[in-house]
Amino acid sequence: LPPTPPPPVAPIPDASWHAFVAECLAEAPVTGECTTWASGNNYGTMPNWDTSLVTDMSGWGTAAQGFYGKTTFNGDIGRWDTSSVTNMRYMLSVASAFNQDIGGWSTEKVIDMEGMLNKAPSFNQVIGSWNTEKVTSMRIMFVYAERFNQDIGSWNTTQVTSMHAMFRYAFRFNQDIGSWDTSKVTDMSLMFMGPGSGTSFNQDIGSWNTEKVTNMQYMFYHASAFNQDIGGWNTAQVTDMK
């Protein structure tokens, strides 16, 4: 007789995702291949999880959770079904070893990407095809994402209201984001702020719609490479440019 095929993997319950991440990574902190944990249920090891029911993959609620601060984690979670996820806030923040291909994730329901790859210095994967049409916050999304330099110029930013510190200290980032729709953005403070050693960003963003922006504080502080014509920007609502 042929061996009995393994049972289909059961979907992770939405309310259990954070607890299951903690339990699995306690056993297999780098890969998430928590075979002992998985032997006691029918969810499988982390790379094989069915996450189709999960809505909240955030890394911070009232405290660190999920992958937040999991500094050695570098598991292959690129096959996850994220089509129900609305919250990726701080999801991979301080996951300092993480550099896996997550470019195929379905992000069409995600509203919050605040700090998603904040302090993820190893990450440099192609994520340009993510559907960001519902995202309202990209603040501090790539802070200290020191290696990140991928084309995200086609992202839909029509609903984004905050880009505060989005690329702060992401000193290798230099991609064309000039066609982004920034018409709802109110906060661009610290957006391209660099360390004392400077940054690489020098792209034409002169056509950005800045009519709703109120805060541009330190927007280009230590952005040493930047030298583009932004003289046409509408700064009528800006109250802070220091």
Give the residues covered by each predicted segment.
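Negatively charged
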Residues: 4-242
